[in-house]
């Protein structure tokens, strides 16, 4: 069943608000219309393109500063950070991240994105991974965008430990999940 333009545009606004990193191609598939129709709808609704939306989210939310490592040491691009709370990063899977014979992302890149996000979310000068329990749930291919979301689930400053849960998504599908037991200094 086709939706009316007004209904589609209302759903488009809601979808982009809840999932700001969704591409025009993904939106076109979701709504069963052409990419051009999505672009025209966005233009009519004054919704910026994906790159601009990512930049806007980053500017609005990155007022906290990563303490435990420098931003160039983070794998992926951090777009949201609340120290000792939660964080989000994006990794565009490119040719250098995949096996040449099948264009599937090497697992260590997905782990590195999640692990560096788990380190970055810690509100401490020193944060190291003590242990990790991880699971890869599906292959990630070249050209896909991996959005990693980290959430601090337990902080025991007197023991110098923090637990961070990280789930990585392509679209709405979980492709990686991990629980990271992080060591932090006891002085913070």
From Swiss-Prot:
CDD domains: hot_dog (cd03440). InterPro entries: HotDog_dom_sf (IPR029069), Thioestr_dom (IPR006683), Transcription_factor_FapR (IPR017275), WH-like_DNA-bd_sf (IPR036388). Pfam families: 4HBT (PF03061). SUPFAM superfamilies: Thioesterase/thiol ester dehydrase-isomerase. One of its GO terms (molecular function) is DNA-binding transcription factor activity. Disulfide bonds: none annotated. GO terms for biological process: fatty acid biosynthetic process; negative regulation of DNA-templated transcription; negative regulation of fatty acid biosynthetic process. NCBIfam families: PRK04424.1 (NF003359). This is Transcription factor FapR. The lineage of its organism: Bacteria, Bacillati, Bacillota, Bacilli, Bacillales. The gene is fapR.
């Amino acid at each position: 069943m086709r939706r009316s333009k007004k209904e589609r545009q209302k759903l488009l606004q809601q979808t982009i608000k809840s999932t700001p990193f969704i591409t025009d191609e993904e939106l076109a598939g979701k709504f069963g219309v052409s990419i051009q129709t999505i672009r025209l709808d966005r233009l009519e609704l004054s919704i910026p393109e994906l790159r601009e939306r990512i930049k806007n989210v980053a500017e609005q939310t990155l007022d906290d500063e990563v303490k435990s490592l420098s931003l160039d040491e983070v794998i992926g691009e951090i777009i949201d950070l609340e120290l000792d709370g939660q964080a989000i990063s994006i990794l565009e899977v490119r040719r250098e991240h995949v096996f040449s014979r099948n264009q599937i992302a090497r697992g260590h890149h997905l782990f590195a994105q999640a692990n560096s996000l788990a380190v970055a979310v810690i509100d401490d000068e020193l944060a190291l991974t003590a242990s990790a329990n991880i699971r890869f749930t599906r292959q990630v291919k070249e050209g896909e965008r991996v959005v990693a979301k980290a959430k601090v689930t337990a902080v025991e400053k007197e023991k110098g430990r923090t637990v961070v849960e990280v789930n990585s998504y392509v679209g709405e599908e979980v492709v990686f999940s991990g629980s990271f037991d992080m060591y932090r200094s006891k002085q913070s």
